[in-house]
Amino acid sequence: MDIRELIDITELSSIATEGPPPPPPPPLLQPHHSALSSSPLPPPLPPKKLLATTNTPPPPPPPLHSNSQMGAPTSSLVLKSPHNLKGQGQTRKANLKPYHWLKLTRAVQGSLWAEAQKSDEAATAPDFDISEIEKLFSAVNLSSNSENNGGKSGRRARPKVEKVQLIELKRAYNCEIMLSKVKIPLPDLMSSVLALDESVIDVDQVDNLIKFCPTKEEAELLKGFIGNKETLGRCEQFFLELLKVPRVETKLRVFSFKIQFHSQVTDLRRGLNTIHSATNEVRGSTKLKRIMQTILSLGNALNHGTARGSAIGFHLDSLLKLTDTRSRNSKMTLMHYLCKVLAEKLPGLLNFPKDMVSLEAATNIQLKYLAEEMQATSKGLEKVVQEFTASETDCQISKHFHMNLKEFLSVAEGEVRSLASLYSTVGGSADALALYFGEDPARVPFEQVVSTLQNFVRIFVRSHEENCKQVEFEKKRAQKEAENEKLKKGVYNEN
């Protein structure tokens, strides 16, 4: 018969005699070799309400044996809620799963937590049964063999080492997924980061590390952990490795910038050179200039005697309106006619698109985007310089980082200065291109200029091809008519 049954029998006896309840039985002593010797027995349950109450209080329980640990429970084994726990002070028989909250250390005046501290507010929360909580939220399954019939002790399974989770469950899970893709130990991973070694880790992995840098709250939680760090989960251990490095998130961002720097600079330089080449090719094409003059003459001929006549030039977007004016039979546009005249009188101008080989590529580049990338690169380099300065006073762990960063900066700063100079030159060339066609660069940006020119080239080439097909078609039709006429004459002569 266990202690709880003894207590129930005692209570029933007290009810029947209407006297004060007897003292609870002393705890049973267990041999030192027993499997239960390390866990003290629970204290007696509070007595139930008696049918006939007396003024005599129940005697205190007898003193515990000197070898028992019930007199000095540790904070790791006893639930310490201030109220609302049934059997407060009961010994926990198992580790419980944590509730990943962010606790407040101070009740702000006027908050509900301050109100809850009042004695009259404490009773509003329901009572919690410790045994039920242990049953539902135990971190490991409780062994049923330790409390089987008659106190018989069965063979206990070897306890599994349970990992301690301090980080919110979903975040820890996602972090461990990320870490599963990194095939090197965590200390070696951080050593590669501090060495700025791009052969071990790529930019995507570095960016993922940045996403999982511990927050201020998580850092405080980990720093406050006083248990065995070997029992922490992989996410927590990863966070601890990160926290060993001063300003770890800034260093990771510097590493990410370094990895991407050369490819970004190469792309920027390629785009700027394409724009520079396109502007020089367009402005240097004498064939395009003569075609523009031919269009001006054609337009003045059509608009003679009207307000549109006697023009000294035209806006660039007027090039695309050459297809709007059609012949009386609607079979030919003004663009077709321009191509026809050039083919007959100035055939050497028809291949003017070959003078502007960079034009099409330039239409795929946004000068505004290049400006934003250029600014981002400059600001990124400024942050690298700031971290380089800050790492001078770091501990030994940042020594290699500082040394490798110095080598990178010696190259990167020169690259950015060269790029800034090229950008300034290209910006001036882009504005000059709009001015070349008599446009205001503020109203007609570079992108609009090259887009209009490329569309004009495309329509011009298509119209010339259509003219050539039409000429070939008419030539074949004339030959066929001539053959038919010849056949008719032959039949007539025979008759």
UniProtKB/Swiss-Prot annotation:
Stretches assigned to the FH2 domain: 86-486
Pro residues bias (residue ranges): 19-29
Gene3D superfamilies, sorted: Formin, FH2 domain
Composition bias type Low complexity, residue spans: 30-39
Domain of life: Eukaryota
Chain intervals for the UniProt region annotation (Disordered): 1-92
PROSITE patterns noted in UniProt: FH2
PANTHER family, sorted: FORMIN-J
Family: Belongs to the formin-like family. Class-II subfamily.
Stated name of the protein: Formin-like protein 17
Source species taxonomy: Eukaryota, Viridiplantae, Streptophyta, Embryophyta, Tracheophyta
